[in-house]
Amino acid sequence: MKLSFKCLPVGNLPYENNELATKLTIKLFDNIPFLADLPNADDEDNLLNRTLEGVPGFKLKHKRVIVEDSNRHKLKLTQMDAIFNNPDIDKLEEFKFHTFFLDRYLQIIKRIKPRETVVNLLGPLTIAQLIENKEASQILADKFYRKLFIQTVTIRALWIIHRIKEVSPDTLPIIILEEPLLGRFGDLKRENEELTRDIIVNMYAKITQKIKEFHGAVGIQCFEKCDWKIPIDAGVDLISFDAYTNPNNINIIAEHVNNFLMGGGRINWAIVPVMTEARVKELTIDKLYDRFIKTVEALVLAGVSEYYAYNRASVSIQGNTDKLPLIFAEKAIILAKQLSRKIPTIKAHPTPDSNQ
């Protein structure tokens, strides 16, 4: 499935109510609405709760994650196994989640019936590293817990895909797995020799395969330096990286990236910085465009086809905007949208003998 969006909606929004979030979504992301978190409206509105709250085997308290091993939970996990293998719509409803913006989001989908939409969930590698009563390297090497992470994320994804398809059957749901701790995989591997790269690739592949079977697409988002070969080898449709702070993160695997793009994959360049008010204040569209072109050209010089580098590109802000003053949060998001409209379209398709 070929993704078509040029501006990827990213991060928490700064609003304290649904009305303002709805207004921005319809104005800037009518072709790809997203299920935003609004922590300024509800401090429990976050990806951790969205992904894990109410799931058997996990206990959440003040943003802490505890894994529970009781027999009662293991019985529930057996039920999850059955649902994962045969995703019955009624059974999926047992694992629904709620967010502050969810009802309004589904109303938007029903009303405008967009081509694509985005829902973010926490990815399994990050979930494992947030658990307090188990070592991450040990828990990821344990087949039982990997299965728990895979099924938790997948079942949550399948439920929201079903809800989207209910109101707009032709909309493509893109499930983006947020993996801020993907860059720590090397450290985890050194801590436990049983934890191999193939284990992590296989974990992502199982989630990706099941979501695609349910007519969704899958992306991985990480704004730290990491090994992007892992999600690419797992068969994801999108990788989203910090192109502002780590612009060369994918240049070192240019051949891998080129094959990914040729196969229909897409790269999101999170190149609009939102770290500080001062940084946003000095931004202009000309500065951003110049930086974007130079960053993409560096990838082309590394060996990636210019045709695919530009034609399979989208842009976004670099993270959450809920801590910024409203005027600067909106400025960053608007600039990302403006930049997306300036992404060059390369018309000359590369020949088999040239990567240009």
At which residue positions do the language-model features occur?
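Catalytic-face loop-and-helix region of soluble metabolic enzyme cores
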Residues: 237-349
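Short amphipathic alpha-helices and their capping/turn segments at secondary-structure boundaries
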Residues: 101-115, 153-171, 254-260, 292-308
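Active-site loop segments of alpha/beta catalytic cores
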Residues: 144-255, 266-269, 273-290, 294
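Charged/polar, solvent-exposed surface patches and flexible loops
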Residues: 20-27, 110, 202, 209, ...
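Alpha/beta catalytic barrel-like cores
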Residues: 1-142, 233, 265, 299-302, ...
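Extended hydrophobic secondary-structure segments that form protein cores and membrane-embedded regions
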Residues: 118-121, 174-179, 221, 312-318
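An acidic- and aromatic-residue-enriched active-site/binding cleft used to recognize and process polar
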Residues: 13, 39-41, 122-124, 180, ...
